[in-house]
Design a protein with these regions (language model features):
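Beta-strand repeat architectures
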Residues: 1-35, 41-55, 63-127, 133-152, ...
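Short, conserved catalytic or interaction motifs in soluble domains
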Residues: 155
Length: 214
């Protein structure tokens, strides 16, 4: 199915391919939950409206924009190298294992389960003012930043896993930008491997966040 213009659908099912062509926008607007086993491809835009949950089960290759304006987006496959914007009150859940996407922005919630790593890879400068969350405990979800861009994390994050910066910069104004504080000193909780951590204000980095280089 080829999307070449702006199209709004109330439902989507099946195992086929939805190609989001350049200049095309597919809006899914429904109050009922949608589960899609196929894949999204192409460089167009995917927009999520409605109070429902959209669950993606396929290995998506979409590299345009994904906008979660209302409701929840749950990915049990792979989202693709898409630029993701999550509005306040909406949630993106990474349920399919480690995933790599483009940039993240917006004021919503990103949920990363225990042992899962979400990598954001972009050369763009973006701000995410929402909350990156996950289960509490010693093994939480992990965040990795690659690409040359600057990612500003201005929310109070609660994910309990590690933060790795492989490229570009993560900018924070408080220790809470890096998620929950480990209960004890934890080697590699913050790793700088080709990237930079920027403090945009004066604060004290909790000593339990042991920094590893390389």
């Amino acid at each position: 199915y080829d999307v070449r213009s702006s199209i709004t659908l109330e439902s989507l099912s099946g195992t086929g391919e939805v190609r989001l062509s350049s200049g095309g926008t597919l809006t899914l607007d429904s109050s009922s939950d949608i589960s899609f086993n196929g894949i999204f491809s192409g460089q167009g835009a995917l927009t999520k409206e409605g109070s429902n949950e959209l669950t993606l089960l396929g290995t998506n290759t979409h590299y345009g924009s994904t906008n979660v304006n209302t409701g929840n987006l749950t990915v049990k496959g792979f989202l693709g190298n898409t630029n993701l914007t999550i509005a306040a009150g909406s949630t993106y859940s990474v349920e399919g294992g480690d995933d790599t996407i483009g940039f993240i922005s917006g004021a919503g919630n990103i949920h990363i389960p225990s042992g899962v790593t979400l990598t954001t890879s972009t050369n763009s400068n973006t701000n995410f003012s929402g909350v990156i969350s996950g289960p509490s405990g010693d093994i939480g979800g992990n965040l990795t930043k690659s690409g040359n861009g600057n990612l500003t994390l201005s929310g109070i994050n609660t994910y309990a896993g590690s933060t790795t910066i492989r490229g570009g910069t993560i900018s924070i104004s408080a220790d809470s930008g890096l998620g929950a504080v480990p209960g004890s000193a934890t080697a590699g909780h913050l790793t700088l491997n080709g990237g930079t951590l920027e403090a945009k204000a004066s604060f004290t980095l909790n000593p339990n966040r042991e920094i590893s280089l390389g």
